[in-house]
Amino acid sequence: MTNTLNTAENRRTMYLLEGNIGAGKTSLGNVLKASSQFEFLEEPVDTWREGFAGNLFEMFYTDMPRWSFTFQIMAFTTRAKTWSEILEKVSGDQVVLERSIYTDRNVFAKNLYAVGAMNDSEWQVYQQLWEFLAQNYCDKPDKILYLRTPAELCLERIKMRGRNEEQQMQLDYLKRLE
């Protein structure tokens, strides 16, 4: 794959903004964007709510064992699409992406597999698709910014931001993601 970020005529620095759900990634990303020194690409939550045959964001949080595989495939592919399409269009020389394909696999999907919400076959399919898309469609980041926020504070923030889909989230789930 041609690296869309780092060709000789188009050198950009790509930062991944990582952290638990409710850690403050969007808030920090918006502060960086307001500085006019960074482009900020938010996690595509609206796509997960409206871009498919149902609100997969809500379906996932309502019935994780049923929707884990579907949601993780969708979340990963929307991020890969973001990297391959949107990054070509941004004009800034410093780009911050909220969350990444690496967290999709190494935190979320891996955790769901470990607790039995994805079976062996689903996990193997997920990993093979992840490897293919990561190698062929996703540029490697230059830096990773990780917000370490206690799970208890993350849960408070999740409740305050008021996304209906997340209101039943449990503290133990956030602790497993740390």
Enumerate the predicted regions with their spans.
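A basic- and aromatic-enriched beta-loop-alpha substructure that forms the phosphate/nucleotide-
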Residues: 71, 76-119
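Conserved lysine of the Walker
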Residues: 25
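A glycine- and Lys/Arg-enriched "phosphate-lid" helix/loop adjacent to the NTP-binding pocket
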Residues: 106-178
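Hydrophobic anchor at the beta1->P-loop junction of P-loop NTPases
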Residues: 17
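Conserved substrate/cofactor phosphate-moiety recognition/catalytic segment
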Residues: 34-78
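Post-Walker A alpha-helix
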Residues: 28-29, 33
